[in-house]
Curated annotation (Swiss-Prot):
The keyword Ribonucleoprotein appears for this protein: yes
Protein name (record): Small ribosomal subunit protein uS2
Family the entry assigns: Belongs to the universal ribosomal protein uS2 family.
CDD domains: RPS2 (cd01425)
One GO molecular-function entry: structural constituent of ribosome
PANTHER family cross-referenced by the UniProt entry: 30S RIBOSOMAL PROTEIN S2 PROKARYOTIC AND ORGANELLAR, SMALL RIBOSOMAL SUBUNIT PROTEIN US2M
Database matches in HAMAP family: Ribosomal_uS2_B
Coiled-coil boundaries: none
Region of interest: Disordered: 226-258
Annotated Gene Ontology cellular component terms: cytosolic small ribosomal subunit
Length: 258
């Protein structure tokens, strides 16, 4: 059974592409028809592609991997942040800083600065420093949180990227491709699908469409985590689940005989 229905996609407006004069011919295979100068996306293909992306991210999660959600356009910012947080993943929803992946050593120093400023405040330094200096530190902190808060706990490279609008996030995609990080993307009719490993042909401009698809990808990660957590709990407690079941069956039999 598909993880998303045609009805859900239609209600969210996922089928509306861009104007026919603004399109990428490589998206032709995902287009159903044209109506009033707008391309209509083939939702049967979207359903199939959502399944593929879902299963991929679920597997990444089952293997203990992390996913970086990227969506800096206004229509995507809130969904990317809330859904990444819900799934316990990382996100960038403001500006993509150059070298965020390819020069992570430098970026990680800036992330470390967030904790440094927090510690300064906790230790009471803000109370003894000149007011002007405290104001500057707070400005610096707010700026760092705005751009890097979503990756402050990212200690290593993500195992996958989820991107809303590859045209808008071309820098993120270029860095991920350079590092051979697989990319899942919501790809509208004006984008190049060849840059994306798992294409989800869909409207990337409607908030409801972006929210629906981003939430589905978060669901995939959460489902994968459930598989991991069950196995980890069993391993940590050194419990053979089959043996436990046999033991319970034996106890039940003995109780019946008594």
């Amino acid at each position: 059974m598909a993880v998303i229905s045609m009805k859900q996609l239609l209600e969210a407006g996922v089928h509306f592409g861009h104007q026919t004069r603004r399109w990428n011919p490589k998206m032709k295979k995902y287009i159903f028809t044209e109506r009033n100068g707008i391309y209509i996306i083939d939702l049967q293909k979207t359903v199939k592609k959502v399944d593929e992306a879902y299963n991929f991210l679920k597997q990444v999660s089952e293997d203990g991997g992390q996913v970086l959600f990227v969506g800096t356009k206004k229509q995507a910012q809130e969904s990317v942040k809330s859904e990444a947080e819900r799934a316990g993943q990382f996100y960038i929803n403001q500006r993509w800083l150059g070298g965020l992946l390819t020069n992570y050593k430098t970026i990680s120093k800036r992330i470390k600065r967030i904790s440094e400023i927090e510690k300064m405040e906790e230790d009471g330094l803000f109370e003894v420093l000149p007011k002007k200096e405290v104001v500057e530190l707070k400005k610096e902190y707010d700026r760092l949180i705005k751009f890097l808060g979503g990756i402050r706990d990212m200690k290593s490279m993500p195992q996958a990227l989820f991107v809303v609008d590859p045209r808008k996030e071309r820098n993120a995609i270029a860095e991920a491709r350079k590092l051979n990080i697989p990319i899942v993307g919501i790809v509208d009719t004006n984008c190049d699908p060849d840059e994306i490993d798992y294409v989800i042909p869909a409207n990337d401009d409607a908030i409801r469409a972006v929210k629906l698809l981003t939430a589905k990808m978060a669901d995939a990660i959460l489902e994968g985590q459930q598989g991991v957590s069950n196995e980890e709990v069993a391993a940590e407690q050194n419990i053979d689940l089959d043996e436990k079941e046999k033991s319970e069956e034996t106890e039940a039999t003995e109780a019946t005989e008594e």
